[in-house]
Amino acid sequence: RETYDKFFKNFGLQLKYGLYSGWGMNKEVLQDLIMFKSVKLGKYVTLKEYVDSFGEDQKYIYYGSAKTEDAVKALPQSEKLLDEGYDILCFSDDVDEFAVKMLGKYEDKEFKNILDESVGASPEDDKKNEEDKDLLEALKNALGDKVSKVKVSTALKNHPVCLSSEGEVSIEMEKVLSGMPNAEA
């Protein structure tokens, strides 16, 4: 394993680009070769190792996009997941999210960005959003076009607010795409 870890540190990025650039054509071959840093373990793990460490109640392969595992840990959305015993994969390369979009799933488990607004959502959230409707509307009006919506969430533990993404393109993917030539600002 030590030899493969060294190999992956040198050529892992090319494996991920191979997965993405081939539009997932070689995903059956490449999916077991790519690795990501585990926030919990602080080392590279394969997708198989990550899924094998799942608890019975875990439905998703959770990931956060940041340059380091510590940066993923610092995201408000990660605190509750880690406290509940879930691991989070650190996607530190620009291509990581694009590559897993080509995979779609791994062993019937979907990939889920921890910044996705649905992570940690509960039926209790809907009730609280209805109860606090006037306050949330006032906050949205005060913030204007800076946010698309304001809502209550039980997904956070010790942080009062967070940014989340909605839809297929995450905040990090938007940054990568906006940095490309001919990107509209």
Show where each model-derived region lies.
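Conserved GHKL (Bergerat-fold) ATPase module
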Residues: 1-185
